[in-house]
């Protein structure tokens, strides 16, 4: 009687990403940089950090790492491509205030420390510290679901597909 086996609902494995920083989760549309706010690089979330530690939002591989330490890309084990960008226009700091703990092509585990950044250095230089996490290949997975605005802790689920 295998006839009805095909009627069983196939369980779809949820693909999730967790907050890379602790702070205040805000809608991506509210950030001051139009490239992010208009989702030109992908849909996602923004967090105003309360401390300067950035952690891996999922298990995966570092596929892009800017030498300045302000941005990196991770491809998760599930094939989700995440772009994490610390601050607005912080590339201009040329790495000042950033300490990177990983290299390109490193395999990382969810919760692993990736970058330390000095919030006071960023703010003192006049930069917004809001940290964006984007799903750059979201079209492959459908809708990007996001946690509601509010206080989040690094490691808390904030995006799922």
Predicted regions span which residues?
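Contiguous, well-folded functional domains in the mature portion of proteins
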Residues: 1-161
């Amino acid at each position: 009687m295998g006839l009805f086996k095909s009627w069983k609902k196939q369980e779809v494995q949820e693909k999730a990403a967790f907050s890379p920083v602790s702070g205040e989760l805000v809608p991506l549309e509210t950030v001051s940089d139009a490239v992010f706010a208009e989702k030109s690089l992908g849909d996602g979330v923004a967090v105003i950090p309360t401390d300067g530690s950035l952690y891996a939002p999922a298990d995966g591989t570092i596929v892009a790492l800017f030498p300045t330490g302000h941005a990196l890309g991770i491809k998760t084990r599930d094939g989700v491509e995440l772009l994490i960008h610390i601050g607005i226009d912080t590339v201009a700091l040329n790495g000042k205030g950033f300490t990177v703990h990983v290299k390109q092509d490193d395999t990382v585990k969810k919760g692993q420390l990736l970058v330390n950044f000095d919030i006071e250095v960023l703010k003192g230089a006049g930069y917004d510290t809001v940290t964006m996490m984007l799903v750059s290949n979201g079209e492959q997975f459908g809708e990007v679901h996001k946690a509601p605005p509010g206080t989040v802790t690094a490691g808390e689920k904030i995006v799922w597909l």
